[in-house]
């Protein structure tokens, strides 16, 4: 959808956290979280495309879609509960759309197969929603919490390993000055360049330019 989606490419996010915190421990499976998030929103994503293709965009707009998939405040401890709440919210909206479009089953399934043909899968839906929403509402809040926990973990390690208070103070100060912020590091993230979606884009551009 946009560069923000690629910057949020799930397999690259651990390295972004390392760049922010200088701590390479893995404390939360961000790729799995985004996979489950994608699976949860996929049915509504298909409905969004269905409405657009059928000229009824006003009845379920992108803004309606984004409102339906909002997560609320993220925390590491409640990540599973957040996803479960999302699944229930999506299910309610899907039921509403089915009731509003009782004859749409076959055309909905056709759209579903077509978006899969185009490369969107239930596991990777996050890459194809509005980029700003993904960046600002889903990935950044998640990474802020992960990085805060990693920073606290590293600060605790430094404190325990220090021989005296002066060393502890100096090393903690040095560590603090070495930290980066999540938004800056995400915007510098080029880990998507080896991804299948990015290479598909390159291939499409090459084919397009070759036709001219």
Kindly give the residue locations of the regions a language model identified.
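Acidic, divalent-metal-binding catalytic cores of TOPRIM
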Residues: 1-212
